[in-house]
Each structure stands twice: as C-alpha cells, then as structure tokens.
C-alpha cells in the first residue's frame, strides 16, 4: 500500500523486520518531485553477518526439501505477485520515476522470471549414461551450493531481484539480498509477499545499505556465490573481489548498445523502435539503444522523421499517463547527464533535440528530456561512455560493414540491433557483431527468462549469465558419480 507518510525502511533477517544496528541513513526522494518518501539504513557489516547466519541455519532444512515442493511454494509466491501487479508498478514509479506503463512492463518481466523458477524440477535434472564400462554406470547430479547473495541496481527494482533469488531458492539455496539504497520500498514489498507465500524463516534475507554491505557480502566466507547487476567499474570490482575470496561471481555490467539502420528497413517501425529503446525508462537501462549507425543512403530521411517524432514526446511525472519520459533517479545523475550533453556540444556534435531546457514544463524533479546528437564520432565521450539517460547519438556510416566495425569498436558488448528487411544483411550482422544479445527488427533484444541474459567484453564478468539453464548451473554444484555394484 502506497501512503504519503515518510517511511523508515528496515532489514528483514531470519523472518523478521528489524532495525539496522547502524545509525547512518540516507534519504530516498521521489525523483519526479524531489520530496523525501523514505529513509533507508546504510547497514554495517554486523547486519550482513546476522543475515548470513540466518541463511546458513535455514539452508540445513531448506536444501533437503524435495525439489517439487520448493517449486510449489514458489508458485504461491508467483500468484501473490500476479495479484499485486498494480501496487508493485505504482511503488516502482514512486521511487524509481519510470512511467507507470514502463513499470507495469517491468512487473510482468519479473513475474516471468518467477515462472521460470517454478519449472526448476525440469531444469535441475541431471544426466546419466549406463554401462560406461562393464557393470559400471555414470551420472551427474545437481545440488544446491549453500548461501548465495544478490546485489541489484535501482533501474529495475523488481525484475532484476526476481532474476536471482527465486531461481536460487528453487535450486535449494538460501539468499541474502542487497538491493539499491535508491529503491528500497519495492524490495520490502517483494520480501513481504515472499513470506506471505509461506516460506520458512531465513530462506530470504534483506539487508539495506551501500558500499559496506557490498564489501561484507564479497568478503563473507559463508557466502558461496554472488550475482550482481550494475555499472562496469563496480561490476569489475565485485568480480575481482568476490573471486579473490573464493566465490562464484556473475557480474552484469555497463553497455553502449548500437542499432544499425539499413536503407531497406521499414522506416516508420524503425523510428518508433529506436524511440522506444532509447527513451523509454528514461534511458536508464542496460539494453537501451544509445547509438544509431545509420547508412548514408537513408540517413537524412531517417533523422528527419526521428527528430519530428521525438519532439512529440512528453516529459514529466510517471504517474501521468501522457508522459513518455520520466525523471532520472537523482539530481546528481541529472547533473552528470547534463555534463555529457554539454561535452557533446563542445566536441562538435550537432544537437538536434535538446533535453536540457525543460524545467519550466516539469517542475523540480530530476528531468532531462529526450536528446539526439548527429555527427558523432568515436573520439567523443558521448560515443564512448555509458550515459544511462535519454541521450541518443547518431553516427552516419556508408554500409553494413562499416556499421558492424563501428559497433565492435566499443568496449561494451551487451546488446545490438539491426533494422532491415534483407535476410542476408541480418545473417551477416548476427555472425559478425560482438554482442551477447542480438536483435533483428527487435527494439530491445532482452531475452525471455528461459534464455540466458549476459553480454560480452566489458558488459559482463563471469562465465554463466542470469536466467535459463545458465542460472540453474550458476546456483548448483555438479557431482559426477561413477558406480558399480557387486
């Protein structure tokens, strides 16, 4: 239930809501207004240790619950999430700022991840080969690995936690969750519904906070694996620190996703696709299109239509249904984004749509409108860096080959898209582009939960991605059994 009172956020440890043992807190504003809606604790190491102890104790019994029973329990959780979809979407819009339409879509994608977790009995099946030698059989068995942890970002406060803890718990593990201190309210509601579904205490524990919580998770000897989603520098740190302490780590990092626009594309659908990918969720997503490589032959026509359609987008509070671009998460991020726009102008790019001057229209929130640059090149920071905002750079290329070369020069390799009606172009793109997730006339090539989600290069640190069979492999340990009976 959403109220107007300012809330003091708590941790959830061993089945109970508890105050942090620390005294430091951080204010949580509504990004659309700047008004404080909550205070979140910046929990110390001691709170993490209590959560891990609770998870360890719960693991002794939870890991022995039959796999189908664990899945049935998760199905109850799935039903509660479905019953509370509207409330969950409103909480996301309140504390994250994205439009209610975008928030509703996120809720659905989170629910799909839990649907995957309910199918764990199929995904956890091992392998067997009888008679590998005279009278000897071989088999592979999958077992849970123990206490695992997830560290999640502000931009998808429902979907990304639900990539992690339902699947890990379905595999028989117990979980310590640290969500972004910028979006603590949705995390609270996810945990409330989890225990309404009847799970034993200590199976899922929530510790709110910042860097101290992250470091405590990475250094705790009883945590066996860590899942992370966030920026590239922090992902690299999480991976290096976690593996140094003997943990499995999957760290999904930053992005600079490119789209190549071919002359044979469907122009109207391509323009709408680029707009949706670049500017929905205020561009604060790792699968947003941030660079368009448009072939010269169609460039002028494409840009004219793109600019005209972009100028129609309304910016403002995500609760107002006419608004397409909501606020950025914080004032500090807004200032960072404005710095990138200013650098693009200073570096000589042509600013076709300027999202800086909108305060008179939208008030005191952390707003930056949809922004488009033309004439961008690889020497500019707006091409090189992840901006994480509704800022789109256009690079003109002579053909598909040059577009692929440009895309592959980025240090990031999360997603990439081609807009074309030519199957040969699509095949060439698919086979030569360096990206973990590829779209052909698909605006945001984020796969469904039964496929793995992960990028390449500086967009991912680790071996196994989230979701799908990758997720099950990450949260389980194999035992290879060779047996003979006399």
Swiss-Prot record:
Organism: Bacillus thuringiensis (strain Al Hakam)
Subunit composition and interactions: Homotetramer.
Stored Gene3D superfamilies: Aldehyde Dehydrogenase, Chain A, domain 1 (3.40.605.10), Aldehyde Dehydrogenase, Chain A, domain 2 (3.40.309.10)
Functional description taken from the UniProt entry: Catalyzes the oxidation of malonate semialdehyde (MSA) and methylmalonate semialdehyde (MMSA) into acetyl-CoA and propanoyl-CoA, respectively. Is involved in a myo-inositol catabolic pathway. Bicarbonate, and not CO2, is the end-product of the enzymatic reaction.
PANTHER family the UniProt entry points to: MALONATE-SEMIALDEHYDE DEHYDROGENASE
Stated name of the protein: Malonate-semialdehyde dehydrogenase 1
GO BP annotations listed: inositol catabolic process; thymine catabolic process; valine catabolic process
EC number: 1.2.1.27
PROSITE patterns registered for this protein in UniProt: ALDEHYDE_DEHYDR_CYS
Keywords: NAD, Oxidoreductase
Reaction equation(s) it catalyzes: 3-oxopropanoate + NAD(+) + CoA + H2O = hydrogencarbonate + acetyl-CoA + NADH + H(+); 2-methyl-3-oxopropanoate + NAD(+) + CoA + H2O = propanoyl-CoA + hydrogencarbonate + NADH + H(+)
Class of this enzyme: oxidoreductase
List of residues binding NAD(+): 154, 178, 181-182, 231, 386
A Pfam family this chain is assigned to: Aldedh
Pathway: Polyol metabolism; myo-inositol degradation into acetyl-CoA; acetyl-CoA from myo-inositol: step 7/7
GO molecular function: malonate-semialdehyde dehydrogenase (acetylating) activity; methylmalonate-semialdehyde dehydrogenase (acylating, NAD) activity
Active site: residue positions: 286 (nucleophile)
Family the entry assigns: Belongs to the aldehyde dehydrogenase family. IolA subfamily.
């Amino acid at each position: 239930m959403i109220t107007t009172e300012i809330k003091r956020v708590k941790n959830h440890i061993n089945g109970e809501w508890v105050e942090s043992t620390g005294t430091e807190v951080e204010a949580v504003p509504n990004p659309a207004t700047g008004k404080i809606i909550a205070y979140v604790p910046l929990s110390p190491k001691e709170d993490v240790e209590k959560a891990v102890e609770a998870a360890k104790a719960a693991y002794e019994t939870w890991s022995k619950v039959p796999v189908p029973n664990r899945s049935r329990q998760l199905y109850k959780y799935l039903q509660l999430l479905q019953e509370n979809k509207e409330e969950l979407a409103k909480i996301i819009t309140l504390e994250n700022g994205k439009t209610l339409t975008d928030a509703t879509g996120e809720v659905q994608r989170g629910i799909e991840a839990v649907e995957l977790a309910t199918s764990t009995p199929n995904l956890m099946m091992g392998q067997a080969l009888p008679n590998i030698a005279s009278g000897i059989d071989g088999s592979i068995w999958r077992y849970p690995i123990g206490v695992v942890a997830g560290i999640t970002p502000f931009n998808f406060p429902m979907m990304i936690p639900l990539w992690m803890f339902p699947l890990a718990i379905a595999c028989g593990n117990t979980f310590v969750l640290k969500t972004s201190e910028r979006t603590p309210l949705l995390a609270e509601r996810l945990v409330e519904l989890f225990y309404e579904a009847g799970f034993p205490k200590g199976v899922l524990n929530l510790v709110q906070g910042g860097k101290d919580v992250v470091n405590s998770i990475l250094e705790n000897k009883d945590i066996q694996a860590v899942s992370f989603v966030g920026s590239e520098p922090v992902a690299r740190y999480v991976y290096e620190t976690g593996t140094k302490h003997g943990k499995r780590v999957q760290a999904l990092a930053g992005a600079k996703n490119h789209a190549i626009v071919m002359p044979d594309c469907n122009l109207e659908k391509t323009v709408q696709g680029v707009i949706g990918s670049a500017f929905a969720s205020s561009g604060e997503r790792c699968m947003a299109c941030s660079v368009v490589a448009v072939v010269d032959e169609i460039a002028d026509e494409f840009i004219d239509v793109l600019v005209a359609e972009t100028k129609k987008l309304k910016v403002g509070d995500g609760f107002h249904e006419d608004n397409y671009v909501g606020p950025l998460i914080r004032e500090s991020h807004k200032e960072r984004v404005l710095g990138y726009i200013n650098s693009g102008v200073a570096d000589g790019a042509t600013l076709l749509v300027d999202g800086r001057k909108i305060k008179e229209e939208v008030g005191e929130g952390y707003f930056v409108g949809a922004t488009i640059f033309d004439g961008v090149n690889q020497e500019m920071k707006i091409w090189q860096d992840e901006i994480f905002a509704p800022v789109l750079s256009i690079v003109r290329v002579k053909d598909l080959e040059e577009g692929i070369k440009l895309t592959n020069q980025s240090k990031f390799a999360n997603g990439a898209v081609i807009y074309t009606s030519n199957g040969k172009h699509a095949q060439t793109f698919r086979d030569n582009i360096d990206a973990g997730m590829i779209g052909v006339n698909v605006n945001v090539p984020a796969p469904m939960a039964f496929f793995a989600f992960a990028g390449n290069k500086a967009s991912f640190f680790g071996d196994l991605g989230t979701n799908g069979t990758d997720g099950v492999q990450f949260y389980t340990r194999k035992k290879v059994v060779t047996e003979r009976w006399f």
